[in-house]
Amino acid sequence: MAKIIGIDLGTTNSCVSVMEGGEPVVIPNAEGSRTTPSVVSFQANGERLIGQVAKRQAITNPEKTIISIKRYMGTDHKVNIDSTEYTPQQISAMVLQKLKADAEAYLGEKVTQAVITVPAYFNDSQRQATKDAGKIAGLEVLRIINEPTAASLAYGLDKMDTNEKILVYDLGGGTFDVSILELGDGVFEVKATNGDTKLGGDDFDQKLIDYIAETFKAENGIDLRNDKMAIQRLKEAAEKAKIELSSATQTNINLPFITADATGPKHIDMNLTRAKFNELTHDLVQRTLEPIKKSLEGSGYAMSDIDKIIMVGGSTRIPAVQDAVKDFTGKELSKGVNPDEVVAMGAAIQAGVLTGEVKDVLLLDVTPLTLGIETFGGVSTTLIEKNTTIPTRKSQVFSTAADGQTSVEIHVVQGERSMAADNKTLGRFTLSGIAPAPRGIPQIEVTFDIDANGIVNVSAKDKGTGKEANITITASTNLTDDEIEKAVNEAKKFEAEDKKRKESIEVKNNADQIVYQTEKTLTDLGDKVSAEDKATIEEKVKAVKDVKEGEDLEAIKKATEDLTQTFYGISSKIYQQANPEGAQGAGFDPNNMGGANADNASAGNDKKDDNVVDADFKVEDDK
């Protein structure tokens, strides 16, 4: 059976995992890291960079580098690059394509299906947008799963025989969630969830950026926030300082030549203490405490009922965050999970549940926000309360507001406010063909159906005439089927172009390497090579150099192969002449270009360096 991957599509970093031998395993990316920056960059030559390589060049290419696109999922936000507009779904799809490609390279097989995580407090539009991104990337998204729920799966997989109530505190790069779950006998039941989709590590970085910029402005009269390249350097420095202050009490921010004026270049060289960082970000930390309180209220539990607190997301490494949660809850924090990887691992476990690889696990999640329709007077009438276990279905009968009314518009909203206008509009549809009657007489049954992904379907039926209308909620910010199809084709085109560009680089690098090795070996052999053979080789070298600057890859491959075979034949002849009784000898091997010299090229490749030790990440396990 084909593997289903689990993906944590994060605001700042993403991670991919898969089940192997009944356990979730994090898949390293092509660069060797276990997480991939959710960064996309477009180059002047049309090349597209994704992940760490895109993040590295953000300073020199700030206008065409896209970060934290997840914050715009489910909105009508567009990114304009070279007069081409990209939706958040398309940019996210590019990150997903990178994760998909890394998974395929690791597994050695095609990957077409995935479970993708979203913040628990994502609304319907944001969930739909995430599914669309997966489709554009060439993935069938079998399930959308909430991030805190995924984390609880990874935490509780080896604790199936225990009964625990856990609180998952998930502070990522751009979003924040709190979920209360009950674990017991393989059942993972979410009792309540709350959060803020506009709060995360990016906001902590921004506090530092503003502080550094304001300090610099006070000293030099220049606002660095008006300079895109300078602001990108500030972002990088702020993130680095934040990370360093998690383990040190002071850090130095040194940015030479940050800008210049008539008096010359300007530099930043300042020390930042953890105490100052805590002061700057105190309000952000405090904002995370109210959702804890609301989640407890929604679950019906007291803090004393909670057995474990699981900290998820890179931003939970901030000491002030840990201290605030400990002080607020009065409990020690669990150290049994890796906050950067646990969500992806949970997604892989859910994938294992879907394939049957993981047995005796039942996941019961909830809808994070109240769902209802607008009724007379603009009131929001609730059909499904927040924290209702999904999947679920709920019906309610309504009537007309005017005499002789033959159609009604169903306005579907999501949110906690009493007036429909103050809530998030999920969609509108019309039920027509109602038999004319005095107001209040027709009976119109409205049914809400939420699937396991948290995605909403709404139907309305006139019980008198049997007329029916329904809608799968797709807000105006979501893509139509045609738009998705177009985006899929564009993604395939990008993928093909990237593949061709990569092949071109590899072919040209190989040609360069063989030319270098040939010329070096030719020099080393000296007068052992006849003038005639030397002329033949030099002619073949010139042929490679002539074609390798072009784009005809087949011509480069042919010229390289000709050079390889010609030199191999000549070098073999030389070694045979030097050792007529011996075998072929360790001549120039065109298939082994890794050695620094000919003597080492064909030997010792399998020998392990005794000075190299394998490193592994170890987390403390809670028993």
UniProtKB/Swiss-Prot annotation:
CDD domains: ASKHA_NBD_HSP70_DnaK-like. Keywords: ATP-binding, Chaperone, Nucleotide-binding, Phosphoprotein, Stress response. Residues 605-623 have a biased composition (Basic and acidic residues). GO terms for molecular function: ATP binding; ATP-dependent protein folding chaperone; unfolded protein binding. Induction: By stress conditions e.g. heat shock. SUPFAM superfamilies: Actin-like ATPase domain, Heat shock protein 70kD (HSP70), C-terminal subdomain, Heat shock protein 70kD (HSP70), peptide-binding domain. Residues 580-623 are annotated as: Disordered. PROSITE patterns: HSP70_1, HSP70_2, HSP70_3. Pfam families: HSP70. Residues 591-604 have a biased composition (Low complexity). The modification Phosphothreonine is found at residue 175. Acts as a chaperone. Belongs to the heat shock protein 70 family. This is Chaperone protein DnaK. It comes from Clostridium botulinum (strain Loch Maree / Type A3). The gene is dnaK.
